[in-house]
Amino acid sequence: MKLHILKSKIHNAIVTSGDLEYEGSITIDNELLEMVDMIPNEKVLVVNNNNGERFETYIIKGAHGSREIQLNGAAARCALVGDEIIIMTFALMDEAEARNYKPMVLIVDKENNPKSRHHVGEQDEPLS
């Protein structure tokens, strides 16, 4: 049996823009993606801390260092510019692997600058 396990998350990101006319997705600064091992086209679950909305979409790579978090298409209706969100990826694992896996968490500040990074259950690695 395979289990859906949290793989990584970007915590407390701020939505910087939205584009209703785009086909769909979430554009994320590539530097942030690399820091938590997320990749373009990967499915994400997004939680809006301001209104409780949860939605799924997929990642588009944004410009490295831009600090961009842009919601596109229908996803742009789920959060406003300035809303705080959590972006999560998941992986399928067998139970033995899942019991030992430690997801990577990247915490960002109000400008989406990386503050710290850690595996769940381990000490923060300060980044600024």
Swiss-Prot record:
Record-linked CDD domains: Asp_decarbox
InterPro entries in the cross-refs: Asp_de-COase-like_dom_sf (IPR009010), Asp_decarbox (IPR003190)
Domain of life of the native organism: Bacteria
MF term (GO), any: aspartate 1-decarboxylase activity
Swiss-Prot/TrEMBL catalytic activity: L-aspartate + H(+) = beta-alanine + CO2
Active site: 25 (schiff-base intermediate with substrate), 58 (proton donor)
Binding annotation for substrate: 57, 73-75
SUPFAM superfamilies (UniProt xref): ADC-like (SSF50692)
Pathway(s) per entry: Cofactor biosynthesis; (R)-pantothenate biosynthesis; beta-alanine from L-aspartate: step 1/1
Residue list for modification Pyruvic acid (Ser): 25
A Pfam entry, by short name: Asp_decarbox
Name of the coding gene: panD
E.C. number(s) listed in UniProt: 4.1.1.11
Name the UniProt record assigns to this protein: Aspartate 1-decarboxylase
Cofactor note: Binds 1 pyruvoyl group covalently per subunit.
Enzyme class: lyase
Primary localisation category: cytoplasm
Keywords: Autocatalytic cleavage, Cytoplasm, Decarboxylase, Lyase, Pantothenate biosynthesis, Pyruvate, Schiff base, Zymogen
Subunit structure: Heterooctamer of four alpha and four beta subunits.
Function in brief: Catalyzes the pyruvoyl-dependent decarboxylation of aspartate to produce beta-alanine.
Post-translational modification: Is synthesized initially as an inactive proenzyme, which is activated by self-cleavage at a specific serine bond to produce a beta-subunit with a hydroxyl group at its C-terminus and an alpha-subunit with a pyruvoyl group at its N-terminus.
GO cellular component: cytosol
